[in-house]
């Protein structure tokens, strides 16, 4: 058999050849485009990973104008308590701890520029959660950005800003050392010393976002503190329960028709329980709360439950008093 190759074969139309060339060109374009895109994407990811993180110094500078000092007053009108807060609303909203604002006390806020403003309302509060938002008559404040608590991992670097022992806007860096349940509340455990005056300050990540509110220190382990997650503040932001300061000051006031007090100190009533804070001006630092109603006819029983929050305090029951230092009773705490 003779095979002849004279170059003859089936003819291809010119249009068909064009389609084939176009298909090859498209294939080459997509192939080279994919290869070119991969290095670009990798380069972008590398640049994002290598982007410089903020330093503690830069974060402290950025948030300085948003940190405030909160003071509440005692009976004589002088400052009795001091804590920290931070701006969450440009229209004068400040977040802090409930225990920082002092229940039924006049409250004032000092801004970074040194100006002092009386709180006009308790915008939102939750005594059980130990959280509060107050309002001052000041516009144009610089609110801090709030972070997502679930993104704050154990071991993460954090920055705390507050007023420990009155040392305003002090900055300390540390790490998240865990999450703990304390008295039924979820808390962020910190390898950071938290001192009196720090309460209510922000716990910041390395982007300057707030992830928690500094709340308490460990009484057992030094340089260990706890913060309330910022997610627990969100319900107060979403559904505030505003109370004008005039009404706030009357919360817990004793019924003058049933009780009278002597010797100073601060007596309050809540949910049928009477409590007292501070040292009285009477003998031995005593202060009395006396019933003004007539007792029932004898014989009758009287039951009283006494709880001391301070080991230095003492409590007693008074059966008769002359309105001054002279009174009769006994101290179930043995004066201790």
Please give the residue ranges for each predicted region.
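Catalytic nucleophile loop of clan PA
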Residues: 86-87, 194-214
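N-terminal activation segment of mature serine protease catalytic domains
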Residues: 36-84, 93-94, 98, 106, ...
